[in-house]
């Protein structure tokens, strides 16, 4: 779902800026359509990541997220995970809040809020989402199941 800043239609717009504010999940098997979030996310949803397949020893993803996906070589063959990773970035604080759900939108939960001073990535080989914080001269790493 998009928040249009100028005239336009539901699926298209003449707007100079479109912001994705919710995600519609359509199940072609039964024709059901549901929104991922109960209320639109005014901040916008710039990050939607999910696994799509396996090829040449790597897990494939829905889009190019090379800076967010690491340790993705020599992976044992497996089916794609039934997970969505959604990121919402605050325009004010630049903090990114990460949510996970299954690919049908069920089980949506907030995973972590990542401050602008930290980095995060998916570690494919170890099935982890890692948040890396700089602490003085060292680092602090948080790991979450992916």
For the regions a protein language model found, what residue spans apply to each?
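Sequence signature of WD/YWTD-type beta-propeller architectures
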Residues: 1-146
